[in-house]
C-alpha cells in the first residue's frame, strides 16, 4: 500500500500538443503513470488538451478533461474534483511550469493539494539557472562560468570578461527554445533579447561555451527514503553544442574509461540527492576529452525525452516507477515488471548497444536553415538495438525512412570533396553521411576529429562500415562475406545496391546459405533472470532466444518516427488495434522503432519487435511468426507503402486489399474510378513530365493544385498560380514519388469537409462529418475542423453520405477509410481518399464515442458491423461541439515559411470541446496560441487577392473596439474604400512587433517562401515573438466571432466522461 494513506485521488497534468522539444514521449510516460497509479488503487484525474494521445482515452485515467492546461482551467478542475495530490513531473515543461504557477498563486495551498514526487523547492532549484548554479557550488559539483541575466547589458558585460563563444539558455523552457551559441556581440544581443521573451520568468543563463567536449547523460531514480540508482548512461555522438534532442545518442556510454564512468555516476547520485528529487531525473555533463575534467550542464527534474529513451533502451519502466515513488512507495517495495522476480531497486545491465537518431522536418521546409545547435529542431526519433555499435547505427539509419538503407547516399556521393568538407565543418542533419563519404575518400580520421570533435572511437566504427562496403563491392557474395556484412548490420537492399543487383536476389542468396536473423530479448538484466515480457530485437550470427507459439496471432505494422504529416495519431490507432486484437482472443504483435510511443511500451502488445519498418525486416518477422496476417491500415503511409512488396511475397493483408489501396493511392486509377461511379471530382489530368504539366495547365487555367501519389502530409503538394511555378514544382514533385503520376487539379475555392468511416464492404458507418474553417487548399492537417459540421445543407450531407458509401463499397473497404470533399455552390467534389486510419480517427472516436479502431479490427478479422451493433449511414451527431486546432513548431525552425497551404506544416493538434460552438472554438484558439484579447492593437498586411474581404473584416474589428494598423498597400486600399486606419511601413511594423506593441497580426502572403521578402520576415517575427498570427482570412473571421460571442466565465468545464454520458443518452433512442 502507498506510504501516503491520505492520497486517494491524484490530478495528472499532461504535456499538451506535440511540438518540437515535447513530443510523444510524454504520452508514453503519462499513460504509464496513470496505469501505475491505478494499480495502487488511486483514482486518476487527467487534464490534457491533446486528443491524439492514448492517455486522453477514458480507459487510461478514471476522469479525463480535454481542456487547456491553464491556471484558471486547472483551478476549476481542482475545485470540482478535489484531488489530494497533483503529479506534474510527467507532463514535460508544460506540466512543470503549470505546477510552479499553481503553487506561486496559492491555488495548491487553497485547496490543500500536495505536489507529489519532486517538491516545489526542488523544481525551482533545478529550473532556475542561478539557484541551480548555487546549489552545485554548495555541493562541490563544477559548473561552467556563467551569469544569469534579465537584460542585454549584463550579458554584454559578461562577454567582455570571458570572451566568445557563449551559450545562452533561457529558464523554464523546453527543447532549448530561445537559446543558442553567440560568437560576437551582435549574435549575443539577438539571442538574449529573444531568450528573455521566451523565458517564463524573463531570465537567461549566459555561460562559457564548452563546445567540443563530450556530452554524457545519466538517467537517475530516487525515492523518499533516499534510495538511489542510475538506470542508464548515454553518450551523445555529437559533442556539446548540439541539443541532445538533435544529437545521435548511444546507450550505454561507449568511449568512457571505467574511472570516468564511475566519476560521473557518483556525481549523478550526489546531485539527485542534493536536489531531493523523488522519481526520475536526467543529468547532463560535459566531459573534457583531454582530461578527467567535467562540468554539470543541466538537470531535468522530471521525466524527459531522455527518460523515454532510457526506458526503451533498458526495459526499465521509469515513468511507471516514478509514479509509484510519487505516492510514497520505495524502490525496494516495487516489483520489476519485466522480470517479475526482482524489485525496481536494481541497476539495469545491457548486453547490447542502443542508438537513437533524430528525425528532422527539413523535407517539409526547403528554405529552413539545416544547421543544428542548442535549439532543438527534430520532430521525432528512431531507436535501434543491436550487438555492436555499427549494426545498431545502420539499423537506426534505415528506420528513419529518408530513403537511406546504409551510409551511402547518391546526392552525397555526387558532391565535390570541398562540399563534403564544408558539410562536416558544421553540425547539420546530413553530417553522418558526409563523414562516411569523407572516409570513403580517405580523408584522415585525425582531421575529421579535429573539425567535428566527434570521438575517434565513433569515427573508427564508421570506417569499419566503409571498409565493409569496399569488401562487399570487391567480393563475389560468398557465404563468409554475407555473414560478415549481415553481422555488421548491412541490409539486403544496401548489399544489393553496392553489387548492382536486386534486393530479392540477396534475400534468396542469404537463405540459400542459411543466413537468418536470430532474435533476442530485452530483459533489463543481461539475461541473468528470465524475462516475462516479450520485448525483442534481431541480430545475426547468435543464438535465437525467442520461442514461437502455435496460437492465432496478427502483426500490426507501426508508423515509425514522428514527423510532420504522420504524428502520434497513428500510434494511437496502432495501440487501440493491439488492444482490440487481445480482446478478440488473438495474440498481438507490433513492429515499430519509435522510442517515444505507447506502442513500443513493453506490455502494450503481446509481443514487441523493436525493428526498422522495411520490407526485409517485416518479412523476416512474418516468416518466423507465421501469423494469420498483417494489418497495415494503422501505420500511416509507412505501412501502406510496404503493402505492394508484402503482397508480392505472399503475405496476407488483413483489411482492405492491396488492389484497392493501390487504386486510391494512384491518382490516375483513382480518377478513373470516380468517373465510373459518376462522382464529381475537380477537373484535372495527370502528368509524368514537365511538358505534360505545361499542356494541362494551359488547358485548365489557374489556380491549380498539384498532388503526387503515395506521399504523406501533402508532401510536395502545392497551389500554383503561374506557368513558371508549375515548371518549378513539377521538377521537385517528380522526385518525391518516382514512376507515379502527378495529378494536376483545377483548384476549387470551396469549403472542405472530411469524413472517417468504418466499412465491412457492405455496411458503411460514418461516425461524423467534420467541416474545415479554412477553404480547400489548406492541408486538412493544418485546418481548424469543426464537428458536427455547421454549414452543410441536408442535400449536401446526403450526397457526402452517398459518395462515402459508393466509394467504400467499390473499393471493398474492410476497415477504416478517410475521404476529403470540397463543397462549392451546392456541388460536392471528392478530393482524395485514404483507405486507412487517418489523423482524425482519435479525435472523432473521442468526439462521437464510436470505437472506430476496435470496429475496424473486428471487420478486418471477418465480422460484420451489424453483428457488432452498428448500421450503415451517419451516426447521430452530438449535442456539443468539438473543434480540432493545428499546433505549429515554427519558432524552432529558422527561415521556415509559416503561412498555410496544401503541404502540411503542423506538428500537433489540440481539441476544444464545449456545449456551445463559440466556446469550443474559443478553447481551440487559446490552446493553439491564437487567443486574441478582448481589446488591443491589430496589424493588417493583406495580399491583393484578398482585398475584397478586408473592408468587412476591418469594420468587424473596429466594432469590437480594436485599434487597427495596416501596412502601406493595405492602408491605401482601405483609404480608397473610405475606411481610416493607422498606416505604417513594413520595416516599422517588424520593429514594433519585436517590442510587443501588437496583440495580433493578420497577414496573407503574396509570394511566400523567400526568406528575404519583407512579408516573410513579418510572419517570422510574429512567430518568434509569440504574437498570434493569422495567415488565412477564414481563421481570423471565425476567431473574431468566437471572441465576440463567448463569455469566458460561462465556458463549460466537463470531463470527457460527462460528454460521453450526454452522447449515450442522445444515441439511446437509436433503433439499430
UniProtKB/Swiss-Prot annotation:
Give the classification, highest ranks.
Answer: Bacteria, Bacillati, Bacillota, Clostridia, Thermoanaerobacterales
- Region Carboxyphosphate synthetic domain: list its residue ranges: 1-401
**This protein's pathway:** Amino-acid biosynthesis; L-arginine biosynthesis; carbamoyl phosphate from bicarbonate: step 1/1; Pyrimidine metabolism; UMP biosynthesis via de novo pathway; (S)-dihydroorotate from bicarbonate: step 1/3
What InterPro entries does this protein map onto?
Answer: ATP-grasp, ATP_grasp_subdomain_1, CarbamoylP_synth_lsu, CarbamoylP_synth_lsu_oligo, CarbamoylP_synth_lsu_oligo_sf, CbamoylP_synth_lsu-like_ATP-bd, CbamoylP_synth_lsu_CPSase_dom, MGS-like_dom
List of residues binding ATP 1 = 129, 169, 175-176, 208, 210, 215, 241-243, 284, 298
What name has this protein been given in UniProt?
Carbamoyl phosphate synthase large chain
* Residues at which Mg(2+) 4 binds: 832, 834
Q: What is its quaternary makeup?
A: Composed of two chains; the small (or glutamine) chain promotes the hydrolysis of glutamine to ammonia, which is used by the large (or ammonia) chain to synthesize carbamoyl phosphate. Tetramer of heterodimers (alpha,beta)4.
> Which residues of this UniProt protein bind Mn(2+) 2?
298, 300
- Annotated ATP 2 binding lies at 707, 746, 748, 752, 777-780, 820, 832
GO cellular component annotations of the record: cytoplasm
Q: Which UniProt keywords apply?
A: Amino-acid biosynthesis, Arginine biosynthesis, ATP-binding, Ligase, Magnesium, Manganese, Metal-binding, Nucleotide-binding, Pyrimidine biosynthesis, Repeat
Which annotated residues bind Mn(2+) 3?
820, 832
Share an example GO biological-process annotation for this protein: glutamine metabolic process
Residues that, per the record, bind Mg(2+) 3? 820, 832
Query: Does the keyword Transport feature in the UniProt annotation?
Result: no
List of residues binding Mn(2+) 4: 832, 834
Co-factor requirement: Mg(2+); Mn(2+)
Function comment: Large subunit of the glutamine-dependent carbamoyl phosphate synthetase (CPSase). CPSase catalyzes the formation of carbamoyl phosphate from the ammonia moiety of glutamine, carbonate, and phosphate donated by ATP, constituting the first step of 2 biosynthetic pathways, one leading to arginine and/or urea and the other to pyrimidine nucleotides.
Domain MGS-like per the UniProt entry, residue ranges: 930-1072
Amino acid at each position: 500500500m502507498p506510504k501516503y494513506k491520505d492520497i486517494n485521488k491524484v490530478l495528472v497534468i499532461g504535456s499538451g500538443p506535440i511540438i518540437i522539444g515535447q513530443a510523444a514521449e510524454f504520452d508514453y510516460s503519462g499513460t504509464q503513470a496513470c496505469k501505475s497509479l491505478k494499480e495502487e488503487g488511486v483514482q486518476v484525474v487527467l487534464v490534457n488538451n491533446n486528443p491524439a494521445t492514448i492517455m486522453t482515452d477514458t480507459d487510461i485515467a478514471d476522469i479525463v478533461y480535454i481542456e487547456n492546461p491553464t491556471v484558471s482551467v486547472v483551478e476549476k478542475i481542482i475545485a470540482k474534483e478535489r484531488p489530494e495530490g497533483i503529479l506534474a513531473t510527467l507532463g514535460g515543461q508544460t506540466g512543470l511550469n503549470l505546477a510552479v504557477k499553481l503553487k506561486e498563486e496559492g491555488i495548491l495551498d487553497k485547496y490543500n493539494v500536495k505536489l507529489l514526487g519532486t517538491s516545489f523547492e526542488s523544481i525551482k532549484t533545478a529550473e532556475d539557472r542561478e539557484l541551480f548554479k548555487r546549489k552545485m557550488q554548495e555541493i562541490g559539483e563544477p559548473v561552467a562560468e556563467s551569469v544569469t541575466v534579465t537584460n542585454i547589458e549584463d550579458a554584454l558585460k559578461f562577454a567582455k570578461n570571458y570572451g566568445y563563444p557563449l551559450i545562452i539558455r533561457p529558464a523554464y523552457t523546453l527543447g532549448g527554445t530561445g537559446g543558442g551559441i553567440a560568437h560576437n556581440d551582435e549574435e549575443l544581443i539577438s539571442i538574449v533579447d529573444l531568450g528573455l521573451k521566451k523565458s517564463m520568468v524573463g531570465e537567461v543563463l549566459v555561460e562559457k561555451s564548452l563546445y567540443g567536449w563530450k556530452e554524457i547523460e545519466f538517467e537517475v531514480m530516487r525515492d523518499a527514503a533516499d534510495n538511489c540508482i542510475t538506470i542508464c548512461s548515454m553518450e551523445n555522438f555529437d559533442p556539446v553544442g548540439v541539443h541532445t534532442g538533435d544529437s545521435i545518442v548511444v546507450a550505454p556510454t561507449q568511449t568512457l574509461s571505467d574511472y570516468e564512468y564511475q566519476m560521473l555516476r557518483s556525481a549523478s547520485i550526489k546531485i539527485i540527492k542534493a536536489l531531493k528529487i523523488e522519481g526520475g531525473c536526467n543529468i547532463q555533463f560535459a566531459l573534457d576529452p583531454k582530461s578527467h575534467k567535467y562540468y554539470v550542464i543541466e538537470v531535468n527534474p522530471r521525466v524527459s525525452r531522455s527518460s523515454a529513451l532510457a526506458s526503451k533502451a533498458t526495459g526499465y519502466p521509469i515513468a511507471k516507477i516514478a509514479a509509484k515513488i510519487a505516492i510514497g512507495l520505495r524502490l525496494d517495495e516495487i516489483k520489476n515488471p519485466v522480470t517479475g522476480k526482482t524489485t525496481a531497486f536494481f541497476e539495469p545491465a545491457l548486453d547490447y548497444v542502443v542508438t537513437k537518431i533524430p528525425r528532422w522536418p527539413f523535407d517539409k521546409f526547403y528554405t529552413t536553415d539545416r544547421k543544428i545547435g542548442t535549439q532543438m529542431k527534430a520532430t521525432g526519433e528512431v531507436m535501434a538495438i543491436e550487438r555492436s555499435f555499427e549494426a545498431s547505427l545502420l539499423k537506426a539509419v534505415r528506420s528513419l525512412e529518408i530513403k537511406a538503407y546504409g551510409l551511402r547516399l547518391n546526392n552525397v556521393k555526387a558532391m565535390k570533396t570541398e562540399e563534403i568538407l564544408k558539410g562536416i565543418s558544421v553540425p547539420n542533419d546530413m553530417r553522418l553521411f558526409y563523414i562516411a563519404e569523407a572516409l570513403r575518400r580517405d580523408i584522415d580520421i585525425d582531421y575529421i576529429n579535429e573539425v567535428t570533435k566527434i570521438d575517434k572511437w565513433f569515427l573508427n566504427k564508421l570506417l569499419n562500415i566503409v571498409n565493409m562496403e569496399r569488401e562487399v563491392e570487391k567480393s563475389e557474395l560468398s557465404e563468409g562475406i554475407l555473414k560478415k556484412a549481415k553481422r555488421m548490420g548491412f541490409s539486403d537492399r544496401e548489399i544489393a545496391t553496392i553489387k548492382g543487383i536486386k534486393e530479392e536476389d540477396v534475400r534468396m542468396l542469404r537463405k540459400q546459405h542459411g543466413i537468418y536473423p536470430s532474435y533476442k530479448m530485452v530483459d533489463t538484466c543481461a539475461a541473468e533472470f528470465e524475462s516475462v515480457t516479450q520485448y525483442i530485437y534481431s541480430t545475426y550470427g547468435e543464438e535465437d532466444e525467442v520461442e514461437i507459439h502455435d496460437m492465432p496471432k496478427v502483426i500490426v505494422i507501426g508508423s515509425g518516427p514522428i514527423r510532420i504529416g504522420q504524428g502520434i495519431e497513428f500510434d494511437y490507432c496502432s495501440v487501440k488495434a493491439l488492444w482490440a486484437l487481445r480482446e478478440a482472443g488473438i495474440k498481438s504483435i507490433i513492429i515499430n522503432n519509435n522510442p517515444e510511443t505507447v506502442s513500443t511500451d513493453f506490455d502494450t502488445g503481446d509481443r514487441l519487435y523493436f525493428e526498422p519498418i522495411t520490407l526485409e525486416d517485416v518479412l523476416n518477422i512474418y516468416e518466423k511468426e507465421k501469423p494469420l496476417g498483417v494489418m497495415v491500415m494503422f501505420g500511416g503511409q509507412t505501412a501502406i507503402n510496404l503493402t505492394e512488396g508484402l503482397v508480392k511475397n505472399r503475405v496476407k493483408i488483413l483489411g482492405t486489399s492491396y488492389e484497392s489501396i493501390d487504386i486510391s493511392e494512384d491518382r490516375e486509377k483513382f480518377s478513373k474510378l470516380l468517373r465510373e461511379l459518376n462522382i464529381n471530382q475537380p477537373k484535372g489530368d495527370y502528368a509524368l513530365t514537365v511538358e505534360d504539366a505545361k499542356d494541362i495547365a494551359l488547358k485548365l487555367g489557374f489556380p491549380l493544385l498539384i498532388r503526387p501519389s503515395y506521399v504523406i502530409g501533402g508532401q510536395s503538394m502545392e497551389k500554383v498560380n503561374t506557368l513558371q511555378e508549375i515548371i518549378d514544382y513539377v521538377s521537385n514533385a517528380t522526385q518525391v514519388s518516382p514512376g507515379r503520376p502527378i495529378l494536376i487539379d483545377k483548384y476549387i475555392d470551396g469549403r472542405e469537409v472530411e469524413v472517417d468511416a468504418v466499412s465491412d464492404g457492405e455496411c458503411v458507418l460514418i461516425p461524423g462529418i467534420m467541416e474545415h474553417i479554412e477553404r480547400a487548399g489548406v492541408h486538412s492537417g493544418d485546418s481548424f475542423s469543426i464537428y458536427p459540421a455547421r454549414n452543410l445543407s441536408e442535400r449536401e450531407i446526403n450526397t457526402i453520405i452517398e459518395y462515402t458509401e459508393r466509394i467504400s463499397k467499390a473499393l471493398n473497404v474492410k476497415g477504416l477509410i478517410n475521404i476529403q470533399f470540397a463543397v462549392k455552390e451546392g456541388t460536392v467534389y471528392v478530393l482524395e481518399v485514404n483507405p486507412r486510419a487517418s489523423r482524425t480517427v482519435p479525435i472523432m472516436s473521442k468526439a462521437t464515442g464510436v470505437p472506430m479502431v476496435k470496429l475496424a479490427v473486428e471487420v478486418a478479422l471477418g465480422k460484420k458491423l451489424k453483428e457488432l451493433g452498428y448500421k450503415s449511414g451517419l451516426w447521430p451527431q452530438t449535442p456539443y461541439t468539438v473543434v480540432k486546432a493545428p499546433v505549429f513548431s515554427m519558432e524552432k525552425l529558422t527561415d521556415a515559411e509559416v503561412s498555410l497551404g496544401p503541404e502540411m506544416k503542423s506538428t500537433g493538434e489540440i481539441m476544444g470541446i464545449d456545449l456551445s460552438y463559440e466556446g469550443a472554438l474559443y478553447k481551440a484558439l487559446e490552446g493553439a496560441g491564437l487567443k486574441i484579447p478582448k481589446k488591443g492593437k491589430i496589424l493588417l498586411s493583406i495580399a491583393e487577392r484578398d482585398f475584397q474581404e478586408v473592408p468587412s473584416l476591418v469594420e468587424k474589428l473596429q466594432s469590437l473596439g480594436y485599434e487597427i494598423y495596416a501596412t502601406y498597400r493595405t492602408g491605401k486600399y482601405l483609404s480608397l474604400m473610405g475606411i481610416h486606419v493607422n498606416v505604417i511601413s513594413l520595416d516599422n511594423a517588424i520593429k514594433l512587433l519585436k517590442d510587443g506593441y501588437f496583440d495580433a497580426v493578420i497577414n496573407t502572403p503574396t509570394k511566400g517562401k523567400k526568406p528575404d521578402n519583407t512579408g516573410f520576415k513579418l510572419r517570422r517575427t510574429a512567430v518568434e515573438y509569440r504574437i498570434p498570427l493569422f495567415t488565412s482570412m477564414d481563421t481570423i473571421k471565425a476567431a473574431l466571432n468566437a471572441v465576440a460571442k463567448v463569455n469566458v466565465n460561462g465556458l463549460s468545464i466537463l470531463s470527457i466522461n460527462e460528454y460521453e454520458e450526454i452522447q449515450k443518452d442522445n444515441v439511446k433512442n437509436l433503433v439499430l
